């Protein structure tokens, strides 16, 4: 019976404690002139994530989105959203925890951030903006691969010296 209780304590657990908007900004630096032009924007999306340990097994993950729309060479709008969440995560190995904080949690936060961006763009009276889904698992795998390559690069340079 003690073995069963011990195994239950070790079982991975993931709980969302809170999802909230940490920071938001919307700018239309060239209004009202931007509304007089034909609407043919170039939209750029920048993503960033970061995490911090708040307490034992409790983490804050912040997903930052910056959406910039250029129209005819002028900035039509700049929208920045930091969507955050507090997560309780237990029973994971270090690689599993890193994946949870770097991919799984941002996957949870993205729909909230996307909705906030869409709402702000609409309030700015611009045409509807629907951000495409993001594959955070692929982005995290790319990040891990880049870190591994950066870690092996100095060792290779020393061997060649």
Curated annotation (Swiss-Prot):
Entries under InterPro entries matching the protein:
SecB, SecB-like_sf
Give the superkingdom in one word.
Bacteria
Q: Which UniProt keywords apply?
A: Chaperone, Cytoplasm, Protein transport, Translocation, Transport
One GO biological process term: protein transport
- Subcellular location, record wording: Cytoplasm
**What does the similarity note say?**
Belongs to the SecB family.
HAMAP family listed in its UniProt record: SecB
**Protein name per UniProt:** Protein-export protein SecB
Q: What is the lineage of its organism?
A: Bacteria, Pseudomonadati, Pseudomonadota, Gammaproteobacteria, Alteromonadales
Tell me what gene encodes this.
secB
